[in-house]
């Protein structure tokens, strides 16, 4: 094992255990990068020896940007490959590594490959890499991932292959997993237990826990029939002798049996006689296994953002600059806005980033203070007055005044754009928790914010009346709040935060602000908040290509595609009929988003072929138990696509996902005017996506399409003009977040009422599990996603649906495919959905 220790920084408050620091932190980020750089230079010039595999999310794109900037500074040739799922990951690495079951090709492959370093960005932590890939001895895999839990095989196994896997720690491994009596001790005790391999009861016990500790990517798709063309990657992993599918268990016993079959390279190295010749009692063995089982049963969660980890690398190398800091801020904000980290964690990191901003930005003595920073100055004044009141001496009063002046000076120097070329980062003390409020009208932004929807119930007429009443109490007219934010009267914008904080609590809106950041982009556009950048980049990852969606174009736009690829307003104002023509809009209108028609047309034709050239499918299987009705989908599924058509559709989807990643990557290049224009236009696409998501969520609530079961709530999306959009896992996850947030207060009240009737003590931390299923007509599958929210706003619960989905697929023998890095999502055949959901219902407690 090689664990890359997290460097000391203001971003990391982890305290290393002195007893275990030597074994857990032999290398740090800088030494890991130095190894990568040395291997690249040893490979020679003109050789692309670094392969970067990145998952398609905002944090990963930001981290990839930071890493590639370092590689470019060092003149290291590299290649970026977006990886949207496990099958793409295996297909990509199959061109680099030899097949795992081909022992004869192992040496030849390792000697001929030019790739010396493979960097996994936001993927790989849950995989057992040494048993999944045949890693050449000359190649090193760097795992930089925020997904948790870790696969302990990568961290603590002692095979020779594990020496090629370098896992970058964010502090959790050294402080938690390596603590005395923790997961590392349990793993090592079981790995070197001399009797564990020979005892049949040990094997059966390990297998009995496979549903709760198995790899998320190793879905229970062994029940899938041979006619299903969409196989997950683990189904194609066969051992050479028996053809039996390898288990994806995290159990060290089952992993060790795999290594024994895979040859000498994967045999454990005995460190010493005392360490290897250990005989455990049955009680000890049971206790250590329980430690590992509890670790994997915690559910899916997130650690430090990968962009923050790469920023720490920049700090360690002395290369931290404004661009890397801004990308790290955007990556952190993306985790917070997607409810992957809680408010307390975000506040801790954002405070550290605020200090970095103050330290890294140039100063200006004549920069006036912006209106939205007045709350910071007010807090500074209050703190100074309190300090002066507590002290009776003039010295203390003078010190308080000096501190006040210093804070005022720092804020003024970091909160105002100086000139047309200013690209500084500014701290926003009270960033409004409203969706795209800088680009929408205030009323529209509040309407599309899930937190506001939860408190006011905007899907009811009464909720809309409350929203307008809130505006009236603030002294804002309907005309003003329906204007674009940039067109609102200046005095209203300056007083917006103060009035919201004073009046909104009367409506239950007590957490409408948080610490945020803004970036000035000079004369090209108005300053963009970190949340705005997150929304825009996320929209590009979802729909830059491949979907047809209408966006609102602003008025008074005159665009020419001859000057830039898409004119001044990019995809919003491109005329698809005549791309070379001048286009103009005097008044706001709707246009189809378009960054080029080739990929979108390929998806459309593939879907048409999959649904048109198919054979009849009669659904005769009875659905019992929960009676999940799938019969209504049959008219639309009069035909089921052939294997070839589905394969063509999936290849088209992969091309679209790759192109979307590169568009998002390009949008974060703030040195290019075209990239800034693309990022600005992506906000229009994000607005359109939010409209679709909120409209679908309100439709589910008002039509009472959400079923309340004993242990979770269930909603099935079977129809609608925008149904295809919700087969994208990120869009479905956004809808799930909106529903859980919007219904939080209602669900908590219902649970409190039920507990009162039963005279039951309410739980200290109530989870709000939600399952959404979206029909993909062309593939005859449902995309099923599980979401877990907390009853307390700002608190994040671990997601336990991964193990529940695996267990349900195994018990129900449903045909499923688990191909997303979001482990709480899975594809289920339409005819198997009822049995699958019923078994999930029995598993979730």
Curated annotation (Swiss-Prot):
Provide the coiled-coil residue spans: none
Q: Which UniProt keywords apply?
A: Cell cycle, DNA replication, Nucleus
Q: Name one GO molecular function term.
A: DNA replication origin binding
Question: Which Pfam family is an annotated match for this chain, by its short name?
Answer: CDC45
Q: Name one GO cellular component term.
A: DNA replication preinitiation complex
* Major location (coarse): nucleus
The entry's function note states:
Temperature-sensitive protein required for DNA synthesis. May be a transcription factor that regulates the level or influences the stability of DNA polymerases or auxiliary proteins.
Question: Which PANTHER family does the entry link to?
Answer: CDC45-RELATED PROTEIN (PTHR10507), CELL DIVISION CONTROL PROTEIN 45 HOMOLOG (PTHR10507:SF0)
Say which family it is in. Belongs to the CDC45 family.
Can you name this protein? Answer: Protein TSD2
Which lineage? Eukaryota, Fungi, Dikarya, Basidiomycota, Ustilaginomycotina
Task: Give the encoding gene's name.
Answer: TSD2
């Amino acid at each position: 094992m090689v664990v890359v220790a997290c460097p000391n920084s203001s971003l990391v408050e982890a305290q290393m255990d002195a007893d275990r620091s030597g074994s857990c932190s032999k290398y740090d980020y800088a030494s890991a990068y130095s190894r990568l750089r040395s291997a690249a230079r040893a490979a020679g010039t003109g050789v692309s020896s670094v392969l970067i595999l990145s998952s398609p999310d905002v944090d990963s794109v930001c981290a990839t940007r930071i890493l590639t900037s370092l590689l470019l500074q060092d003149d290291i040739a590299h290649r970026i490959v977006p990886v949207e799922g496990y099958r793409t990951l295996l297909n990509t690495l199959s061109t680099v590594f030899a097949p795992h079951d081909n022992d004869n090709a192992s040496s030849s492959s390792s000697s001929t490959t030019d790739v010396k370093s493979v960097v996994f960005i936001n993927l790989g932590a849950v995989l057992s890499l040494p048993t999944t890939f045949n890693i050449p001895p000359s190649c090193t895999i760097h795992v930089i991932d925020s997904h948790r839990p870790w696969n302990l095989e990568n961290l603590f196994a002692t095979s020779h292959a594990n020496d090629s896997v370098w896992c970058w720690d964010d502090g959790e491994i050294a402080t938690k997993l390596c603590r005395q009596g923790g997961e590392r001790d349990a793993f090592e005790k079981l790995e070197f237990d001399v009797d564990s391999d020979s005892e049949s009861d040990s094997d059966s016990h390990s297998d009995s826990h496979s549903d709760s500790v198995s790899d998320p990517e190793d879905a229970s798709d062994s029940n899938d029939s041979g006619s299903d063309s969409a196989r997950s990657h683990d189904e194609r992993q066969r051992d050479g002798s028996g053809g039996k599918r390898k288990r994806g268990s995290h159990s060290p016993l089952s992993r060790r049996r795999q290594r024994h079959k895979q040859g000498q390279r994967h045999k454990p190295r005995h460190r010493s006689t005392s360490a290897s010749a250990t005989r455990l009692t049955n009680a000890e063995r049971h206790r250590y296994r329980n430690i590992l089982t509890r670790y994997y049963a915690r559910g899916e969660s997130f650690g430090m953002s990968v962009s923050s980890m790469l920023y720490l690398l920049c700090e360690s190398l002395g290369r931290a600059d404004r661009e890397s800091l801004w990308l790290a801020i955007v990556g952190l904000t993306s985790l917070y806005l997607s409810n992957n980290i809680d408010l307390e964690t975000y506040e801790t990191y954002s405070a550290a980033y605020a200090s970095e901003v103050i330290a890294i930005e140039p100063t200006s003595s004549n920069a006036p203070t912006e209106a939205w920073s007045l709350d910071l100055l007010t807090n500074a004044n209050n703190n100074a007055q309190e300090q002066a009141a507590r002290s009776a001496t003039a010295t203390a009063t003078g010190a308080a005044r000096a501190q006040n002046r210093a804070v005022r000076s720092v804020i003024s120097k970091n909160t105002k754009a100086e000139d047309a070329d200013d690209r500084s980062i500014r701290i926003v003390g009270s960033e409004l928790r409203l969706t795209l409020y800088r680009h929408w009208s205030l009323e529209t932004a509040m309407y599309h914010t899930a937190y506001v929807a939860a408190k006011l119930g905007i899907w009811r007429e009464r909720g809309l009346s409350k929203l307008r009443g809130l505006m009236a109490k603030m002294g804002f007219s309907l005309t003003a709040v329906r204007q674009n934010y940039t067109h609102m009267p200046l005095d209203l914008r300056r007083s917006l935060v103060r009035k919201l904080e004073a009046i909104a609590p009367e409506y239950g809106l007590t957490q409408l602000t948080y610490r945020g950041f803004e970036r000035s982009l000079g004369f090209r556009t108005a300053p963009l908040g970190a949340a705005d950048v997150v929304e825009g980049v996320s929209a590009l990852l979802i729909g830059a290509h491949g979907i047809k969606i209408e966006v609102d174009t602003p008025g008074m736009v005159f665009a020419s595609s001859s000057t830039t690829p898409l004119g001044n307003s990019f995809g919003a104002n491109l005329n698809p009929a005549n791309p070379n023509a001048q286009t103009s809009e005097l008044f706001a209108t709707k246009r189809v988003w378009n960054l080029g028609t080739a990929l979108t047309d390929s998806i459309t034709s593939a879907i048409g072929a999959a649904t048109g050239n198919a054979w009849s499918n009669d659904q005769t299987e009875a659905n019992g138990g929960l009676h999940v009705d799938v019969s209504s989908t049959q008219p639309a599924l009069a035909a089921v696509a052939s294997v070839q058509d589905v394969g063509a559709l999936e290849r088209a989807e992969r091309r679209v996902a790759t192109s979307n990643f590169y568009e998002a990557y390009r949008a974060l290049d703030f040195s290019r005017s075209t990239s800034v224009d693309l990022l600005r236009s992506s906000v229009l696409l994000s607005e359109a996506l939010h409209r679709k998501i909120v409209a679908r969520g309100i439709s589910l609530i008002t039509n009472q399409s959400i079923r309340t079961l004993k242990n979770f709530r269930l909603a099935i999306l079977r129809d609608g003009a925008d149904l295809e959009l919700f087969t994208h896992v990120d869009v479905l996850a956004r809808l799930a977040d909106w529903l859980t947030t919007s219904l939080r207060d209602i669900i908590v009240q219902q649970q409190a009422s039920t507990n009162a009737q039963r005279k039951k003590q309410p739980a200290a931390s109530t989870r709000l599990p939600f399952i959404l299923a979206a029909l993909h007509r062309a593939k005859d599958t449902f995309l099923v996603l599980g979401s877990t929210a907390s009853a307390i706003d700002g608190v994040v619960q671990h997601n336990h649906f991964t193990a529940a989905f695996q267990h349900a697929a195994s018990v129900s023998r449903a045909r499923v495919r688990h191909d997303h890095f979001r482990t709480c999502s899975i594809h289920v055949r339409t005819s198997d959905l009822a049995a699958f959901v019923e078994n999930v219902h029995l598993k979730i407690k």
